[in-house]
């Protein structure tokens, strides 16, 4: 196990197209860190730079106590798991697991020990003599993980490994990956564009945007105190409602809110908005009169899509099945402790 340190890492193509813009990050020994962001944000490029599959333009990357800028991928003591399983179709599962170890001249007894240990942990013991075409997608992904595990590397690098799986299997596999990582205690870097995967798996999240880090923290820190409007809308589903400074008063900040001078953006999450019944006092954080446009029942709760008086959308959540009707006018509010205020530059200004 080893820590991974990135110090002002940059990557440019053609000398003037910079895709990684001075990223600095320290990943602790045994930590599970998820790089998350939209397509094109640089997360896979950054992972490939750690792996040595992409050169770096400037800065340093260290794995353990060793700077690996000029170290070949095979010598970095890392193991990668990709979106495509990359299994040899003519080999059995056992042979796929053993292949890399044989190339490294690992003793036969040690190979068998590692295969047995990985197969037991991944529950693929009964598949060892099968070939990849005889396995399901989830089983193939387990074999791909097993091939990484038998390496006993200093770090695991995962590049969107669950993208090819259906929704139910993705949920199962993300739990298995996290359980396995905890039992092995191996430093892990995981790339995904799926914020649900990121939130449920990470010890810490790294949100990337256009080649730079927007925010680093635990999932709950990023959810409760997003550092920018970008993080606020990317983390959480449905995303946070963001309202610009009102010109014609389609909504009102509550009495407990102090607003910055100049332009600002006001944020409130759907679950923090409540319907105010007749006779209820205004909320101390946020108030608005809205028209209901659509209701989504998603099991134990409903999401109500509404419109402010200026036509801007507002989404809020209610428990159970909503009894409200389309085109109904309702008054909504939120507590001051649940609102988020961002300055004109999009950065957080509220505590």
From Swiss-Prot:
Q: Give the InterPro entries listed for this entry.
A: AAA+_ATPase, ABC_transporter-like_ATP-bd, ABC_transporter-like_CS, ABC_transpr_MalK-like, ABC_transpr_MalK/UgpC-like, Mo/tungstate-bd_C_term_dom, NA-bd_OB-fold, P-loop_NTPase
Q: What is its main location?
A: membrane
Which reaction(s) are listed as its catalytic activity?
A: sn-glycerol 3-phosphate(out) + ATP + H2O = sn-glycerol 3-phosphate(in) + ADP + phosphate + H(+)
EC primary class: translocase
Membrane-crossing residue ranges in chain numbering: none
Q: What's an example of a GO molecular-function annotation for this chain?
A: ABC-type glycerol-3-phosphate transporter activity
Q: What is this protein called?
A: sn-glycerol-3-phosphate import ATP-binding protein UgpC
What is the organism of origin for this protein?
Brucella abortus (strain 2308)
Q: Which lineage ranks, top first, belong to the organism behind this chain?
A: Bacteria, Pseudomonadati, Pseudomonadota, Alphaproteobacteria, Hyphomicrobiales
């Amino acid at each position: 196990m080893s820590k991974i340190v990135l110090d002002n890492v940059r990557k440019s193509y053609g000398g003037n197209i910079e895709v990684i813009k001075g990223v600095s990050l320290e990943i602790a020994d045994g930590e599970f860190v998820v790089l998350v962001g939209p397509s094109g944000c640089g997360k896979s490029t950054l992972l490939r730079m750690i792996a040595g599959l992409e050169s770096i333009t400037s800065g340093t990357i260290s794995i353990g106590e060793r700077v690996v800028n000029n170290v070949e991928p095979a010598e970095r003591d890392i193991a990668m798991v990709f979106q495509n399983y990359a299994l040899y179709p003519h080999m059995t599962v056992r042979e796929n697991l053993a292949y890399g170890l044989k190339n490294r001249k690992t003793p036969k007894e040690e190979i068998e020990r590692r295969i047995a240990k990985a197969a037991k942990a991944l529950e693929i013991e009964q598949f060892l003599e099968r070939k990849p075409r005889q396995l399901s997608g989830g089983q193939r992904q387990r074999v791909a993980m097993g091939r990484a595990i038998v390496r006993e590397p200093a770090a695991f690098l995962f590049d969107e490994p669950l993208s090819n799986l259906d929704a139910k299997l993705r949920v199962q596999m993300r739990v298995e990956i996290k359980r396995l990582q905890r039992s092995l205690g191996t430093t892990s870097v995981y790339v995904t564009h799926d914020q649900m995967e990121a939130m449920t798996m990470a010890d810490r999240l790294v949100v990337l945007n256009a080649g730079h880090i927007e925010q680093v923290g635990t999932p709950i820190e990023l959810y409760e105190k997003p550092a920018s409007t970008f993080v606020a809308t990317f983390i959480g589903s449905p995303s946070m409602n963001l309202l610009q400074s009102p010109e014609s008063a389609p909504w009102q900040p509550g009495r407990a809110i102090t607003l910055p001078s100049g332009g600002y953006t006001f944020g409130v999450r759907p679950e923090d908005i409540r319907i105010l019944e007749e006779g209820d006092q205004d909320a101390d954080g946020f108030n608005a009169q809205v028209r209901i446009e659509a209701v989504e029942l998603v099991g134990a709760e409903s999401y109500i899509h509404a419109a402010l008086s200026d036509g801007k959308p507002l989404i809020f959540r209610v428990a159970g099945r909503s009894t409200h009707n389309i085109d109904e006018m309702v008054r909504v509010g939120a507590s001051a402790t649940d609102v988020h205020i961002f300055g004109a530059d999009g950065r957080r200004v509220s505590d």
